[in-house]
Amino acid sequence: LCLSGIGHESALFAAKKLTALKVNALISWGVAGAIDKSLSSGDIVLANSIINEGGHYSTTRDWLSRVSEHLQSIRSIYNGDIVSSKEICASSTDKFHLSQRTDAIAVDMESAAIAEIASANNLDLLVIRTISDDAETTIPEAVLKHTNNLGQPRILNFMLSCMTNPNQIRDIFALKSGYKKGLTSL
């Protein structure tokens, strides 16, 4: 188990460390943003494939089928493609355009890096993501500008941003609630 943190580079580094340990498979798991309007915070997505500007990576079908069958007996899950972005997909407009361009149902920032390493090393790949923010959610400025690569706020700047723009506080609490639902579903 390796906690990569947020973003392509962090995930790439973690996946390389795991392959050095001679693993035979990689799992990308964590939270994602919905770009399909039918998804809500807490929903589980099993990726059929990962899409990014560099390519299209399929997950391991038999592994995906077994996990999907098991999880379906516990709760409803969604199967579809996940687009992996190097930048945060911050607004509902960005999410809409990404959905239209890719037909994916969710967006994350790590799975393509893990998929690249799995593909390069002929490793099985499974991608499990839970939804933290729905397609209509816009990520507040304090979160975008004042959190580290583990999602933790840089307190002083975060608080100053909230004081400068207090309207975002409600959105921060809504995002936190969705994130908590996503983590609980994992």
Where are these predicted regions, by residue range?
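Glycine-rich phosphate- or other oxyanion-binding loops that anchor nucleotides, phosphorylated ligands
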Residues: 1-186
